[in-house]
Amino acid sequence: MLDNIKIKLQYWLPKIWLTRLAGWGANKRAGKLTKLVIDLFVRQYHVNMQEALQPDTASYRTFNEFFVRPLRPGIRPVDPHAHRLVQPADGVLSQFGPITDGKLIQAKNHDYTLEALLAGNYMMADLFRDGLFATIYLSPRDYHRLHMPCDGVLREMIYVPGDLFSVNLLTADNVPNLFARNERVICLFDTEFGPLAQILVGATIVGSIETVWAGVVTPPREGIIKRWTYPQAGEEGAVVLAKGEEMGRFKLGSTVINLFTAGDLQFAAHLNIMSVTRMGEPFAEVRQDEQTPVVFPEGTELEENDAAQPPVAATSEPVQADGQNPAAEVSGQTGHKPDAP
């Protein structure tokens, strides 16, 4: 009964106005009141402030400063192995697996199409058909900066307007096409593993979605799809990000979806539905074929292998305040079909 009421409220409440109000309040400098709100939030959600670069809640001028707090250097070591991709965010792995018949799993008995998620961009959808997907939900207590699973060169960013349903297990089980209906920012990268999409999904009271190259992408919410293209590697103005480097952040909430092209990638064997994720830990890797042992002639002297490279620390770059990369080309809905219902 209570769950039914919560779902009905998702349809009835003025979600955009609630989100604007939350964003306004989260950016206000209110001195002791701000500290009180942060302290209550920390207590309610059991936030581990010992991981934060600034563990003292009095050091944050606004709630948003606290919400996107950076972590202490080295607190999230990045797996250094070249054949591995790393988890892009702290959270919970709500769903992951193969993209089958162009569909992704949202929850038990619920799926949605790749084209709907990508706002009808059939050319981009073709890049990931028969590939892999993973959905990570960031809870209120989590670190809310997003990082790169591997080295990548940004080629395209698309802002897709949409609804602002809350994103959690209850709504995933009850709101059809949830991730394809909500506001989102699609980031497409060239990587050594093939095309990679990292999709930042908005939700109720997510005041803004930001990237390190463009600053605030939303708001404003103008109700139209926007598309930016970027130079390829080696060209002037190319946006090149390293494995583990920050690429974006949420103020507040929500969910990140990764799409991987069909190929030799497989998810790390230890992952399961509802696994806790930590930025920098193993996420996926190149499938290793069994190899025939190499037999050396008798008397051959072999040098010892070099010591394993220690994990490298993740990096966080400040988000630009002045908007989009001047090198980016802004255009219309090239390659798009109308939004799927």
Swiss-Prot record:
Its main location: membrane. Is synthesized initially as an inactive proenzyme. Formation of the active enzyme involves a self-maturation process in which the active site pyruvoyl group is generated from an internal serine residue via an autocatalytic post-translational modification. Two non-identical subunits are generated from the proenzyme in this reaction, and the pyruvate is formed at the N-terminus of the alpha chain, which is derived from the carboxyl end of the proenzyme. Pathway: Phospholipid metabolism; phosphatidylethanolamine biosynthesis; phosphatidylethanolamine from CDP-diacylglycerol: step 2/2. The record marks G253, S254 as: Cleavage (non-hydrolytic). Belongs to the phosphatidylserine decarboxylase family. PSD-B subfamily. Prokaryotic type I sub-subfamily. Pfam families: PS_Dcarbxylase. It is an enzyme of class 4 (lyase). Heterodimer of a large membrane-associated beta subunit and a small pyruvoyl-containing alpha subunit. Catalyzes the formation of phosphatidylethanolamine (PtdEtn) from phosphatidylserine (PtdSer). It catalyses: a 1,2-diacyl-sn-glycero-3-phospho-L-serine + H(+) = a 1,2-diacyl-sn-glycero-3-phosphoethanolamine + CO2. This is Phosphatidylserine decarboxylase proenzyme. The modification Pyruvic acid (Ser) is found at S254. Keywords: Cell membrane, Decarboxylase, Lipid biosynthesis, Lipid metabolism, Lyase, Membrane, Phospholipid biosynthesis, Phospholipid metabolism, Pyruvate, Zymogen. Its EC number is 4.1.1.65. The active site is at D90, H147, S254. NCBIfam families: PS_decarb (TIGR00163). It is a peripheral membrane protein. It comes from the Bacteria.
